[in-house]
Amino acid sequence: MNLLLGHNQFIGISHISEKRSREREKKFSDVKNIYKIVEKAADLGFEGMIIETHPRMLRFLDYYKKNQTFDIEFYLQVPYVQGYIQKMNEKGLYGLISEIIFRAGLKTASALAIKNLINLICKDYLSMVKSALYLEVKPFKDIKIKTILLHNVITDLALSLQMKEIFIEYIQYVETKMKLKPGFITLNFDLFKNCFKKWNIESPTIMTPINLKGYDMNP
C-alpha cells in the first residue's frame, strides 16, 4: 500500500474548524513550512503527494525544484475549481482564460487568440476540457507527475449527466497525448463504479472518501 500526503492543509483548508483553517493559512503561507512537512513525510515513507494548481502549491514546487532534499511523486488534481470560479466572478471568461494562459507560460498570447479560444469553448466543450487540461498541466512538466486526477466537481457533474464521452476523451487524451496516467476524484463512488461498468470503461485510479462516519460519501 502506498502512502499519499494530502494538500488541503497547505492551502488553509479544514473541513472541521474555521479556527484551524486560519491557523493553517497563516503557517503555510510560507512555503518553507510546507517543504519541511513534505520532507518529513517522505522520510517516514510517504511515496506521493496530492497537489493542484493553487498559487501557493506552485510556489512550493518552485522551492522544491531548487532544493529537492527528498524524492516524491506528485498526483496532480485538475482543474483548480475554486480559483476558476473566483476569476470568473472577478474578470469574466476572458480574464479566466488569460490567467490560465499566462500561468502556463504563454505570455504573448494575443487578444484575438484568446477570443478565438473562447469561441471554440462555446461551440465544443470537449475542446475546452482538453485545452484547459493542457494549460493546467504545462507548469508541472519538470516534476514527477504520477497521475492526473480530475476534480470531483467535474467528475460528479459528468456522472450525474451521464456524459460518457467526457470520461473516454479525458482518459484517451491523458494517456496518448500527455503520456500520463489518468485518474478521477469522486464523492459518489457507487455511481462511479456502476457507470464505468455499464460503459465498459476500464477502472482507472480513483480517489474517494471512505470512512466510518460516511463523511463526504454518497450514499
What are these language model-derived features?
Residues 25-42, 128-140, 189-194:
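Short, acidic/polar
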Residues 142, 146, 153-219:
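Beta/alpha (TIM)-barrel catalytic core signal, keyed to glycine-rich beta->alpha loops juxtaposed to Asp/Glu
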Residues 16-33, 113-132, 160:
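Active-site mouth loops of central-metabolism enzymes
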Residues 1-69:
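N-terminal binding-site loop/beta-alpha segment at the start of enzyme catalytic domains
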Residues 1-7, 49-51, 72-77, 148-150, ...:
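Hydrophobic faces of well-ordered beta-strands that scaffold small-molecule active sites
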Residues 94-156:
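Hydrophobic alpha-helical segments and helix pairs
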Residues 48-60, 81-84, 156-158, 190-192, ...:
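Acidic-and-aromatic substrate-binding clefts and catalytic sites of carbohydrate-active enzymes
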Residues 43, 61-71, 137-144, 196-200:
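Acidic (Asp/Glu)-rich catalytic clusters
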